[in-house]
Amino acid sequence: MAKKSLIYREKKRQKLEQKYHLIRRSSKKEISQIPSLSEKWKIHGKLQSPPRNSAPTRLHRRCFSTGRPRANYRDFGLSGHILREMVHACLLPGATRSSW
C-alpha cells in the first residue's frame, strides 16, 4: 500500500492540472498561430508561469486499491499483482487466465 501522503499529493496534482488546463491549452494554441518568434517567446514565458505540478506530464496513474504507481493496467485501473490476484479469485468478469 502506498503512503497516504503520496496519494494525496497525486490528487493535489490532478486538481492543479484541471485548474490550469485551459490556460496551458490556450497558450499552446496561440504559439502555433503566431508566426513571429519574439511573440512566441513572450507567450512561452506565460506558459511557464503556472506551477510545475499543474503539468499533465507530472501525473501518475495509480492502482485503485493499493495506490501503487507502477505496472498499472488502464482497462482495470489496477496494478499487475492485484489484477492477477483478482483474476485468480474470479472477481473480474470477462478476464480469463491464459493457459497453453
Curated annotation (Swiss-Prot):
Primary location recorded for the protein, binned into one broad class: plastid
Record-annotated disulphide pairs: none
Molecular function (Gene Ontology), one example: structural constituent of ribosome
Localisation per UniProt entry: Plastid, Chloroplast
Signal peptide location: none
Key words, A-Z: Chloroplast, Plastid, Ribonucleoprotein, Ribosomal protein, RNA-binding, rRNA-binding
PROSITE patterns according to UniProt: RIBOSOMAL_S14
Pfam families: Ribosomal_S14
InterPro entries assigned to the protein according to its UniProt record, in alphabetical order: Ribosomal_uS14 (IPR001209), Ribosomal_uS14_bac/plastid (IPR023036), Ribosomal_uS14_CS (IPR018271)
GO CC entries: chloroplast; small ribosomal subunit
An annotated GO BP: translation
UniProt cross-references to PANTHER family, sorted A to Z: 30S RIBOSOMAL PROTEIN S14 (PTHR19836), SMALL RIBOSOMAL SUBUNIT PROTEIN US14M (PTHR19836:SF19)
Oligomer status and interactors: Part of the 30S ribosomal subunit.
Cited function: Binds 16S rRNA, required for the assembly of 30S particles.
Family, as annotated: Belongs to the universal ribosomal protein uS14 family.
Protein name: Small ribosomal subunit protein uS14c
Gene source species: Arabis hirsuta (Hairy rock-cress)
